[in-house]
Amino acid sequence: TLFPYTTLFRSAVLIKKAADESQRELDKSEIYNLFVKHWLEAKGNLSIVDLAETHLEGKENSESTSCRAVVEWKGKRYSIGKTGNGPLDAFAGALSEIPAPKFRITAFHEHSIGTGNDTSAVAYVQITCEDGNQYWGAGKSTNVGRAGVDAVVSALNQIK
């Protein structure tokens, strides 16, 4: 499926609204374009300016990834960095250094699109904020780790 089950209702509302406004059924490309606009290109308070990930080697760090990033939150730039058990965990941890809502990742789903060298990963994350509100985001990239990172940005950009 294109969406994890828990995002289907939210997506159905968006699709129904667009169909009602156009007074006709939407075709597949129009539905996909809504997905891209609302989830993959969600504009909001957070954007990535620069991102670097390093897989750490050695006995103690063999499963660790270091993330260094420059992000913009509400128009202000921050240099952030953390180490985690992978790119997604490291990036999510680094975001604790900015004044964004504190959250934890409570669901993650990923699948591939395409075959061979043209394969992309689409990642979906659900975040749960300290206030209990949950938000879904989606990211797409040829880099599996980056798809997850972009999904976190998308989820945070769902917060209004």
What name fits each language-model region?
Residues 2, 6-160:
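Terminal or standalone catalytic/regulatory effector modules within metabolic enzymes
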